[in-house]
Amino acid sequence: MSNNNYERLITKKDVYRVANERLYYLFSLAFQTGDERYIDLMERIGRRMDITLPQDIKRMYCKKCKKPYKNVRVRLKKNVITVTCLECGDIRRFQINR
């Protein structure tokens, strides 16, 4: 007779919750240190777990040089925010609704 009452089953929801916590932790480390390896780890965890990165994290680092947006130029024109990374020169545009 097994002790099924005492065994805890790990559900998919638990796995996604832990992965999401890890994403936020790695992003905080990346933002503190400015190191792109934490961003790379975040993306790998997201791909492995088939999780899309949260929008607030996605918009806080450069997709080209993988550095957190610390050294950027932000411009607002009509309904578009233009973010220019001053490390690599990459330009990202985000539409906003007013």
From Swiss-Prot:
GO terms for cellular component: cytoplasm; ribonuclease P complex. Gene3D superfamilies: 6.20.50.20. InterPro entries: RNP4 (IPR016432), Rpr2/Snm1/Rpp21 (IPR007175). It catalyses: Endonucleolytic cleavage of RNA, removing 5'-extranucleotides from tRNA precursor. Binds 1 zinc ion per subunit. It is found in: Cytoplasm. Consists of a catalytic RNA component and at least 4-5 protein subunits. This is Ribonuclease P protein component 4. It comes from Thermoplasma volcanium (strain ATCC 51530 / DSM 4299 / JCM 9571 / NBRC 15438 / GSS1).
